[in-house]
């Protein structure tokens, strides 16, 4: 019996990856077939058949003989080391569009997490917009409500613009960064802004990107014009390694104090983000490893979608 590696399932996995994951959960983690079917969104009969197919094809022997084994090992280590609820590590492929593949992986994770009519809070950035573009049909069919976590309407349009016009989207009607702390306070006190921020904090699931100070000019927050290169240099000198929603934190995951932009941001602060039950971080690139690790240490995310090389770098850091 041969494995069909060309067909991609509704869960975004080829058959070999499904077999590898089922085998790992069954033999390594000790899950029952019923528990595995719930986790992967498959019928119990499908799980049983794929286990048998794994044995007959040679994937399942004394060890899991699959190119996905490394990803599964990284997922287990990340889950244990950082107390994560959910992890998806995608295998590395030469010359592949990592951002697009992360978006696919994050989209399938969200499809397994969100129930009909629940609310999804979204942060700005390429990773989250890549995810949103691949969720449009699911969002429409399941009547998922969307709410933005920060101001800056333009930053969200590449994702929101792909959605059905009937989709419920609550956007903060303000810039991401005001020109002064006083103006930011005034805007956040406006009911139209305050109501969206309250809705965002009440979301069932959140998805955010993670920026790294080490990215320098490649960082979304710089390319979008929200901070200057000089500001980024100053922020780095204060010990910051990464940011979520424009809020910078150090290697321990603590928000760095005395940073001007923090008082000028219009969005959900990280302390409020942590009250959302499931917080998915989607980010890749070895230069982001320290920032991703810090975000997990700070508890800003409790679920992660990343690539194999980045996962290895995180575990080495």
From Swiss-Prot:
InterPro entries: NagB/RpiA_transferase-like (IPR037171), SorC_transcr_regulators (IPR051054), Sugar-bd_dom_put (IPR007324), WH-like_DNA-bd_sf (IPR036388). Residues 33-56 bind DNA. It is found in: Cytoplasm. The keyword Transcription regulation applies. The keyword Cytoplasm applies. SUPFAM superfamilies: NagB/RpiA/CoA transferase-like (SSF100950). GO terms for cellular component: cytoplasm. It comes from the Bacteria. GO terms for molecular function: carbohydrate binding; DNA binding. Inactivated by phosphorylated autoinducer-2 (phospho-AI-2). Phospho-AI-2 acts by binding to LsrR, which is then unable to bind to the promoter regions, allowing the transcription of the target genes. Pfam families: Sugar-bind. Keywords: Cytoplasm, DNA-binding, Repressor, Transcription, Transcription regulation. Gene3D superfamilies: 3.40.50.1360, Winged helix-like DNA-binding domain superfamily/Winged helix DNA-binding domain. Transcriptional regulator that represses the expression of the lsr operon in the absence of the quorum-sensing signaling molecule autoinducer 2 (AI-2). It also represses the expression of the lsrRK operon. Acts by binding directly to the lsrA and lsrR promoter regions. In the presence of phosphorylated autoinducer-2 (phospho-AI-2), LsrR is inactivated, leading to the transcription of the genes. Belongs to the SorC transcriptional regulatory family. This is Transcriptional regulator LsrR. It comes from Escherichia coli O157:H7. The lineage of its organism: Bacteria, Pseudomonadati, Pseudomonadota, Gammaproteobacteria, Enterobacterales. The gene is lsrR.
């Amino acid at each position: 019996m041969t494995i069909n590696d060309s067909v991609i399932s509704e869960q975004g996995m080829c058959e070999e990856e499904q077999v590898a994951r089922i085998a790992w959960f069954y033999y390594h983690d000790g899950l029952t077939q019923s528990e595995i079917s719930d986790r992967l969104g498959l019928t119990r009969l499908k799980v049983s058949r794929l286990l048998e197919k794994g044995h007959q094809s040679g994937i399942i022997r004394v060890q899991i003989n699959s190119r996905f084994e490394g990803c599964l090992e990284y997922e287990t280590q990340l889950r244990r080391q950082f107390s994560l609820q959910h992890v998806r590590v995608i295998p590395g492929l030469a010359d592949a569009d990592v951002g697009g593949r992360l978006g696919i992986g994050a989209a399938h994770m969200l499809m397994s997490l969100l129930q009909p009519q629940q609310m999804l809070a979204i942060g700005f950035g390429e990773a989250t917009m890549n995810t949103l573009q691949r969720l449009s049909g699911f969002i429409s069919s399941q009547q998922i409500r969307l709410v933005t976590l920060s101001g800056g309407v333009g930053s969200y349009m590449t994702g929101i613009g792909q959605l059905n016009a009937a989709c419920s989207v609550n956007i903060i009607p303000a810039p991401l960064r005001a020109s002064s702390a006083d103006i930011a306070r005034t805007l956040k006190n406006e009911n139209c802004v305050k109501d969206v921020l309250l809705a965002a904090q009440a979301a069932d699931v959140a998805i955010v990107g993670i920026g790294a100070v080490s990215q320098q000019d490649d960082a979304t927050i710089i390319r979008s014009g929200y901070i200057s290169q000089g500001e980024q240099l100053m922020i780095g000198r204060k010990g910051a390694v990464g940011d979520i929603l424009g809020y910078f934190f150090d290697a321990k995951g603590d928000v760095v104090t005395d940073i001007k932009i923090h008082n000028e941001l219009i969005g959900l602060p990280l302390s409020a983000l942590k009250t959302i039950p499931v917080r998915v971080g989607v980010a890749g690139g070895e230069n982001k490893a320290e920032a991703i690790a810090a975000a997990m240490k700070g508890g800003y995310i409790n679920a992660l979608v990343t690539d194999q090389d980045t996962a290895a770098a995180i575990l080495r850091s």
